[in-house]
Regions:
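Conserved P-loop NTPase motor "coupling/switch" region that bridges the ATPase
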Residues: 53-54, 69, 73-84, 88, ...
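Conserved helix/coil segment N-terminal to the catalytic DExD/H
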Residues: 92-111, 117-136
């Protein structure tokens, strides 16, 4: 009998027993309900049952490191001998040895973790294909499966092709339909084209979409005008999936904290290193002797993590960054209303523009220092009551105190304030009287940067402003 390493919540145990022996299954579990644990327990169970000897986990860049460093060590039982290999595109001598050790290991459950973006490259897809062929008794997990909703994308085609080499398959997402029920075709097609009964996308579209022909100028094309037979589609999906919402999970903690990694781009790394060197020089020259001067340097490092530099004359220069892309990916995985806190006005306007483009102008509201006083109450009212206003993008110094924003049960920190009180107050805009659900807090963090130091201090309830003087200055900058 399989013994859990970490005690599951009731909904996790139910889904585990419902799905553990299924060849193909979809875990449609809202963010914060613990779908990763269910997948890891399934891998462990199938290994102990001698049904698989390897697992291949495909996840977005901001998530796949969590599988390696947090989720697998936390949930995979200690009595299961395992070896974990994380994909990296740069093949060093050390990595070659790790790769060979992984291939040659026997008597171990092998777990290979790869970012989905790598499957858009020839090197990544060929490596994965070679590994999969070496391990036919395997399970493949696609975490945040909306990343393969585009049936024409190279990575989608590669994922579906790789899936045909595996014995067991799982897709994990909190929101399988981001814009259209047509999003389901390739996600479920990865599991098996027999599940929906269609091998042709156009046959699937013809059954569940209303398609009309439009003419613009001399060009004629078909356009989806609506959807049909969705009850039939839902009934089919229920046969091979579990849908779990936070509001139905009565034993979850009131507050759930999630971290999404956003690695720095090469451009950001260059500027970050230069800014660190400058800050260290100022420290060594005795020019960082006040709290405000140290916090200014911390803020400048933060700005680089967010994707911009503010020069001494207040000119703002954008830097190539993945942070907004990661934010949009998260929102595509999330259902319902969302609060997005950002410390810098430049980020608030950039986020607003990106979300308006992705989800529509009416879906976005902003609330920060420059928001006119006479508009503020209406903005909050619209967010609380109007279904079209889905995203509240705010500056925690302005909107983090006193407001009631309980229409959202997901809160994203695009960037964090170093002020503990501001963090705690901004958390409570959603988590207060009137909130009927557990609240999930998602922090965007660039690993190995000031982001990590700030979030660790805030989680430990440390007021950073009181900790950055004296000998500790250097540790904050480095």
């Amino acid at each position: 009998m399989y013994k859990f390493k970490t005690k599951p919540y009731k909904h996790q145990e139910k889904v585990f027993h419902q799905s553990k022996d299924e060849r193909n299954f979809a875990l449609f579990m809202e963010m914060g309900t613990g779908k990763t644990k269910v997948a890891i327990d399934t891998i462990g169970y199938l290994y102990q049952s001698k049904k698989i000897d390897a697992a291949f986990i495909i996840a977005p860049k901001g998530v796949y490191d969590n599988w390696v460093h947090k989720e697998i060590p936390q949930h995979l039982p200690d009595n299961i001998p395992s070896i974990v290999l994380r994909w990296q595109p740069n093949i060093t001598q050390t990595y070659k040895k790790e790769f060979l050790d992984f291939i040659e290991a026997s008597g171990h459950l092998k777990l290979f973790v790869m970012n989905i973006e790598a499957l858009s490259t020839e090197k990544g897809s060929e490596t994965a294909k070679w590994l999969f062929r070496k391990h036919p008794k395997s399970m493949m997990v696609v975490d945040e499966s909306t990343t393969i909703k585009n049936r024409k994308a190279m990575r989608t085609r590669n994922v579906i092709s790789l899936g045909q080499l595996c014995s067991y398959k799982r897709i994990l997402t909190g929101s399988p339909v981001t814009k259209s029920p047509m999003d389901l075709f390739s996600q479920i097609g990865f599991l098996s084209d027999k599940l929906l009964g269609f091998t042709s996308y156009y046959a699937f579209q013809g059954r569940y979409a209303v398609v009309k022909r439009r003419t613009m100028g001399h060009r004629s094309f078909q356009e989806i005008a609506g959807y049909q037979r969705l009850d039939e589609l839902n009934e089919k999906i229920e046969a091979f999936s579990s849908r779990v919402l936070k509001k139905d999970c009565l034993d979850l903690p009131d507050k759930i904290f999630v971290r999404r990694n956003v690695p720095l781009t090469d451009d950001q790394k260059k500027h970050y290193t230069e800014m660190k060197k400058l800050a260290l020089t100022l420290f060594q020259d005795g020019m960082l002797s006040t709290t405000s001067s140290v916090l200014t340097q911390i803020m400048r490092l933060q700005q680089i993590c967010c994707g911009f530099i503010k020069d001494d004359d207040d000119t703002i220069r954008s830097i190539n960054s993945n942070r907004i892309t990661e934010l949009v990916d998260i929102l595509n995985e999330t259902s319902g209303k969302v609060i997005i806190w950002a410390s810098f006005v430049h980020d608030i306007t950039a986020i607003r523009d990106a979300l308006a483009k992705e989800f529509g102008e009416q879906s976005v509201a902003t609330y920060y220092g420059q928001t006119p006083q006479e508009e503020r109450q209406q903005i909050v009212k619209n967010f609380q009551e109007d279904q079209t206003t889905r995203f509240f993008i705010g500056q925690p110094r302005t909107g983090g105190f006193g407001l009631t924003l309980t229409a959202a049960s997901t809160v994203i920190y695009y960037s964090n304030s170093y002020d503990l009180e501001i963090r705690l107050q901004s958390e409570d805009r959603a988590h207060r009287i009137g909130q009927k659900n557990n609240v999930t807090y998602i922090d965007l963090v660039s690993p190995g940067t000031i982001d990590e130091k700030i979030i660790n201090a805030l989680r430990d309830k440390i007021d950073i402003a009181g900790q950055v003087l004296g000998e500790s200055i250097e540790s904050w900058i480095v």
